[in-house]
């Protein structure tokens, strides 16, 4: 496994891979890797000749400076995990390599609508940062496929739209959420949880399950369903941030013709902002 930190060396290897006709898969990450990331790697390995994992804590997508400072950086441990998984390349650039002139005045990529709705409304600039760094990685690495987790449901939808709108010839693969045995979605931010909070954390998944049961049963009183869910989370020790029930295909409000719904949930537990989602097939 080769660790690459500079753009010239990355470009040199990408040119060689292209000359050899290799099928390249990209797994973009911010590091602090867990089993969910390893599932992305496994999916990439199954679909390509060469797997490149990027590890870059992208300052452009953090809406809170303290969150950027606190974000876990575990490059050595991450590389050890990826080496055991027989990943071919790790691209781990410094911030100065990606943004040599700083963020002020940096050209960015913005996906209208999806960037500012739902999660984007509560985290201004976040999705603009995501689409910009992903676009830069696509331009640098020129992958045939790229793997993203379905845990970040809106992010995946945004990237799919960006790829379509910008005419990238890249297959976007969504990989299902990996959960702990108690249902908690794996996330790098779970590291912020205390031992006591970790016991409470699966409550977010349990609340989503109860919402799903109501939707499957035909209940469409969405405001009431959401209010009950938020109250339940707050009683469990969470601070409910945002719960939405949307059309899974458009992320717009549900209509009578919607075939699938997605429950999008975000809640604070101590210093950790947990997000999760669940899709539901609706009775027609």
From Swiss-Prot:
Record keywords, A-Z: ATP-binding, Cytoplasm, Ligase, Nucleotide-binding, Pantothenate biosynthesis
Localisation per UniProt entry: Cytoplasm
Annotated active site: 37
Pfam families: Pantoate_ligase (PF02569)
Protein's pathway: Cofactor biosynthesis; (R)-pantothenate biosynthesis; (R)-pantothenate from (R)-pantoate and beta-alanine: step 1/1
Coiled coil residues, start to end: none
Molecular-function GO terms, alphabetical: ATP binding; pantoate-beta-alanine ligase activity
GO terms under cellular component: cytosol
Binding locations of beta-alanine: 61
Positions with a binding annotation for (R)-pantoate: 61, 155
Keyword Nucleotide-binding attributed: yes
List of residues binding ATP: 30-37, 149-152, 178, 186-189
CDD domains linked: PanC
EC number: 6.3.2.1
UniProt similarity note: Belongs to the pantothenate synthetase family.
Subunit composition and interactions: Homodimer.
Remaining remarks: The reaction proceeds by a bi uni uni bi ping pong mechanism.
Name this polypeptide is given: Pantothenate synthetase
Upper classification of the organism: Bacteria, Pseudomonadati, Pseudomonadota, Gammaproteobacteria, Enterobacterales
Gene from which this protein is expressed: panC
